[in-house]
Amino acid sequence: MLDIQLLRKDLDGVAKRLADRGYTLDVAAFSALEAERRAIQTHTEELQARRNSLSKQIGAMKGKGEDTSAVMAEVSGIGDDMKASEAKLGEIQARLSDLMLGMPNVAHESVPVGKDEADNVEVRRWGTPRQFDFEVKDHVDVGTPLGLDFETGAKLAGARFTMLRGPIARLHRALAQFMIDTHTQQHGYTETYTPYIVNPEILYGTGQLPKFADDMFRVEKGGAENTVTQYLISTSEISLTNTVRESIVDGAALPIKLTAHSPCFRSEAGSYGRDTRGMIRQHQFDKVEMVQVVAPETSYAALDEMVGHAEAILQKLGLPYRVITLCTGDMGFSAAKTFDLEVWLPAQNTYREISSCSNTEAFQARRMQARFRNAQGKPELVHTLNGSGLAVGRTLVAVLENYQNADGSVTVPEVLRPYMGGMERIDAPAQTS
């Protein structure tokens, strides 16, 4: 959530910055609500001051033995007026809050202004795409003989679900374990196991609600009169980041660095017809997530560090990639700045997103009321960052395509072999007649 004081001081400036993100701020509606709030708040304060004055007057009158009934009647009437005024003020503040909850974060000044992914800016590349001396297959054609089973996945759960079997399932697990081990042993993160189902207020904290309700899988339990609504997580960023909600952390405890391997569930409501083949866009997929909770002055150094942690995974796997700075129109709702990592997929002859690392600054912290005690001992909002380290399914796709061989086998990257019992390559099972 944006700082409402920022809007009160520079409404037109904030509206311009939000317009760069493709969001139209209803300046007139906000101004009208603010004017009404100020008027009611002023009236409430005047009533409070009048009641306080009359209360003192009653005390003085009683000391003199004078009749206070008329003044007490006025005080009683003021009390009724104050209750009505406070109720109206609460209603206005709730409407302001709803408006604020729908506003995205403002972009950091270093973010390129643009409309969509065409305006993103490439920062650097690593690795040279492999030159094949045979016809390259995509991950579906490579993986199906090795244990990718899209047919059974669809039969069990519908489109955009996949079954993994045998060595492909083991390779998928090996990737996740390798990522977690690297982040915990080399990058300083604490491994965390989180709930996969969370309460609605948790999603408000990290910004998925109210705007992206249609992208979430909702779980309801109980009868018609006592229904409890919860949601499957779309990323473990949600549960990891909310571990500091409604708390004041000792400044000496920062930075807090957490990582988790979890399934992620997304309805992909706006993705009809996109990436319908294979594992690129699934309703259920695994991801290793990185989250950092830091002091404001260190958050952009932490963002660079986090990008480096995601890059390290790709480099150790020997997968060519590029780093992209997202423009204002392509960033996620909560982000102030985002770097995407895109891995090379030879069958598509292009780079595809495999990690997204974002600094949300105080946007999520304000929604969660997550604070730390600064050097002066005063509570201050933390900054929160999140990043994929990496999306496991897409990393599997990249390994299958980049490490495929002419005979249909797949070479196991060296760093994964200890997790695969020393296996150097995955071969299709022999056909039986």
Swiss-Prot record:
One of its GO terms (cellular component) is cytoplasm. Pfam families: Seryl_tRNA_N, tRNA-synt_2b. One of its GO terms (molecular function) is ATP binding. It is found in: Cytoplasm. Its main location: cytoplasm. Its EC number is 6.1.1.11. Pathway: Aminoacyl-tRNA biosynthesis; selenocysteinyl-tRNA(Sec) biosynthesis; L-seryl-tRNA(Sec) from L-serine and tRNA(Sec): step 1/1. ATP binds at R266, S267, E268, E353, I354, S355, S356. L-serine binds at T235, S236, E237, E289, S388. The keyword Oxidoreductase does not apply. Keywords: Aminoacyl-tRNA synthetase, ATP-binding, Cytoplasm, Ligase, Nucleotide-binding, Protein biosynthesis. GO terms for biological process: selenocysteine biosynthetic process; seryl-tRNA aminoacylation. It catalyses: tRNA(Ser) + L-serine + ATP = L-seryl-tRNA(Ser) + AMP + diphosphate + H(+); tRNA(Sec) + L-serine + ATP = L-seryl-tRNA(Sec) + AMP + diphosphate + H(+). Catalyzes the attachment of serine to tRNA(Ser). Is also able to aminoacylate tRNA(Sec) with serine, to form the misacylated tRNA L-seryl-tRNA(Sec), which will be further converted into selenocysteinyl-tRNA(Sec). Belongs to the class-II aminoacyl-tRNA synthetase family. Type-1 seryl-tRNA synthetase subfamily. Consists of two distinct domains, a catalytic core and a N-terminal extension that is involved in tRNA binding. Homodimer. The tRNA molecule binds across the dimer. This is Serine--tRNA ligase. The gene is serS.
